[in-house]
């Protein structure tokens, strides 16, 4: 057997070759140290080059956001479980600002504010990211809000219309139906989504901030039942999450929506609700020892909401003509809309829908107070048909409310006032809707027009909603041409109006009220002419009795 021998020259040559080809990989890394931590906030020393809003890496893969940049230390908000963060642990810079993955893969999913799925349906494949803090579109990049976004709620679409690119505040006390109004708006986009027309389709994002987990699950179940989850993304920061997640959740939803908007698509974002985001930001600011202001909120709480809501826009045609519509929700206490956060958001948005607890308790649902609800876009965001029939609706309801209050103290009213009260009561009944049951705009136009023409005046109040439902089903066949005209974007002309009235009167003849009576108006007697006054004749018909 041959003996294996290696000469020292060969060993020396191999070592020389290795050292000649070796190039050490040196990397420079800034490392800081946690000086103290509590309640989701960590103070870190030793990161002199850290940027504002930069992501920091804590042990265990937990990340934080640098908010306070002081001379000797950084105040960071920990995103995630902060129970294991301890004093003395190392913290590293990432060099990245806070961003979230975006794309169509997020439709139908439930995610946390960092874009991670929490619905148990697997990972979300995404190739693009978008920073959470991005500048809103400039004035020259926008165009006026003129395209309607139908909510399916008669009281809103008729009197406080919402346009694509608008910011409409939904405000009211707790348990007055604020979330239900926004969910109805999402459900009403189903027909547009099924049409397959990109110009009609609206992608929806529901951002739940500080809500109970069961509430978020209920919203998801309602959307799934109606087939709306296929075009909806839910960003969830439930009450059990840290203040950092509640603070960031609206920006995550907005970033995902902006991605679609700049692709020329239309987006609806619901922020439920911004009161809890402001409270979370207040907690963060106080823990970071920032000076408190009114109601202990920090001085930049207005900027917190303004930079979020200013991202809503209808982009110019040069940028694709996409839109981002925002429905922020604010919770009031005892109907006080003059508190700090409500007045801030009212001044930022393009109108508000005020839901009143007294109306809700009376059974008026949605409990919209049309007196102080307003849309600054107005008729520009309505179809021609709706704009024509809804012009006097707000005035009639306002006069009804005023007369109703007066009649409580009046013992006797004239016939005209009684008729106005009767019609107003039927208008209020007509504007009621069941939860999660949006109504197509063509049905809304027909109902409001017929109410204005007095068709419902002879219908008992308890039968108004049943009469409306059965009438609309009948008119879709007996007045199909009128519906086609309305769907084509046209206003009701004289011929269509006459056809609608004729078909309605025919249906009315066969309608039986719940008490068994008919609702057909009796024929009105013609007034006497001037030459007939004081010359009236009475004709007496005698009955012959057979014996």
UniProtKB/Swiss-Prot annotation:
Keywords: ATP synthesis, ATP-binding, Cell membrane, CF(1), Hydrogen ion transport, Ion transport, Membrane, Nucleotide-binding, Translocase, Transport. ATP binds at residues 172-179. PANTHER family: ATP SYNTHASE SUBUNIT ALPHA, MITOCHONDRIAL. Its EC number is 7.1.2.2. One of its GO terms (cellular component) is plasma membrane. F-type ATPases have 2 components, CF(1) - the catalytic core - and CF(0) - the membrane proton channel. CF(1) has five subunits: alpha(3), beta(3), gamma(1), delta(1), epsilon(1). CF(0) has three main subunits: a(1), b(2) and c(9-12). The alpha and beta chains form an alternating ring which encloses part of the gamma chain. CF(1) is attached to CF(0) by a central stalk formed by the gamma and epsilon chains, while a peripheral stalk is formed by the delta and b chains. This is ATP synthase subunit alpha. Produces ATP from ADP in the presence of a proton gradient across the membrane. The alpha chain is a regulatory subunit.
């Amino acid at each position: 057997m041959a003996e294996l021998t290696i000469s020292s020259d060969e060993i020396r040559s191999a070592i020389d070759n290795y050292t000649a080809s070796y190039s050490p990989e040196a990397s420079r890394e800034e490392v800081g140290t946690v000086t103290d931590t509590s309640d989701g906030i960590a103070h870190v020393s030793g990161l002199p080059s850290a940027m504002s809003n930069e992501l920091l890496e804590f042990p265990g893969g937990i990340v934080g956001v640098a908010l306070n940049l002081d001379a000797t230390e950084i105040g960071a908000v920990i995103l995630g479980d902060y129970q294991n963060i301890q004093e003395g642990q190392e913290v590293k810079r990432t060099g990245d600002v806070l961003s979230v993955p975006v794309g169509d893969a997020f439709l139908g999913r439930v995610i946390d504010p960092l874009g991670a799925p929490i619905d148990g349906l697997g990972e979300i494949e995404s190739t693009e990211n978008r920073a959470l803090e991005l500048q809103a579109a400039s004035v020259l990049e926008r165009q006026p809000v003129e395209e309607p976004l139908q909510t399916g709620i008669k009281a809103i679409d008729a009197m406080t219309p919402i346009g694509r690119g608008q910011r409409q505040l939904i405000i009211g006390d707790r348990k007055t139906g604020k979330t239900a109004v926004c969910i109805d708006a999402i459900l009403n986009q189903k027909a547009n989504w099924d049409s397959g027309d990109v110009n009609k389709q609206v992608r929806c994002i529901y951002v739940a901030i500080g809500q109970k987990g069961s509430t978020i699950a209920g919203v998801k179940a309602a959307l799934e039942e109606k087939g709306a989850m296929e075009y909806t993304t839910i960003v969830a920061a439930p009450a059990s999450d840290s203040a950092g997640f509640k603070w960031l959740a609206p920006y995550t939803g907005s970033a995902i929506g902006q991605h679609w908007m700049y692709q020329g698509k239309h987006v609806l974002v619901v922020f439920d609700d911004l009161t809890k985001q402001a409270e979370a930001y207040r907690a963060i600011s106080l823990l970071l020892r920032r000076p408190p202001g009114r109601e202990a909120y920090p001085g930049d709480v207005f900027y917190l909401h303004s930079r979020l809501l200013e991202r809503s826009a209808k982009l110019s045609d040069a940028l694709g003509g996409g839109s981002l519509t925002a429905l922020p929700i604010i919770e009031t206490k005892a109907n006080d809309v003059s508190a700090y956060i409500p007045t801030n958001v009212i001044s930022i948005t393009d109108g508000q829908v005020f839901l009143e607890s007294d109306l809700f308790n009376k059974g008026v649902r949605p409990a919209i107070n049309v007196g102080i609800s307003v849309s600054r876009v107005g008729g520009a965001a309505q179809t021609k048909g709706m704009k024509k029939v809804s012009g006097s609706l707000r005035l009639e309801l306002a006069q009804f409310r005023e007369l109703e209050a007066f009649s409580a103290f009046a013992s006797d009213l004239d016939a005209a006032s009684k008729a106005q009260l009767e019609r107003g009561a039927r208008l209020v009944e007509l504007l009621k809707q069941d939860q999660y049951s949006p109504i197509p705009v063509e049905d809304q136009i027909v109902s409001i027009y017929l109410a204005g023409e007095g068709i419902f005046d002879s219908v008992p109040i308890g039968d108004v909603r049943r009469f409306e439902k059965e009438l609309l089903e009948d008119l879709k066949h007996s007045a199909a041409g009128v519906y086609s005209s309305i769907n084509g974007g046209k206003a009701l002309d004289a011929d269509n109006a006459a056809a609608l009235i004729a078909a309605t009167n025919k249906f009315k003849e066969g309608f039986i009220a719940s008490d068994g009576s008919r609702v057909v108006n009796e024929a009105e007697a013609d007034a006497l002419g001037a030459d007939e006054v004081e010359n009236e004749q009475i004709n007496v018909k005698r009955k012959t009795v057979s014996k």
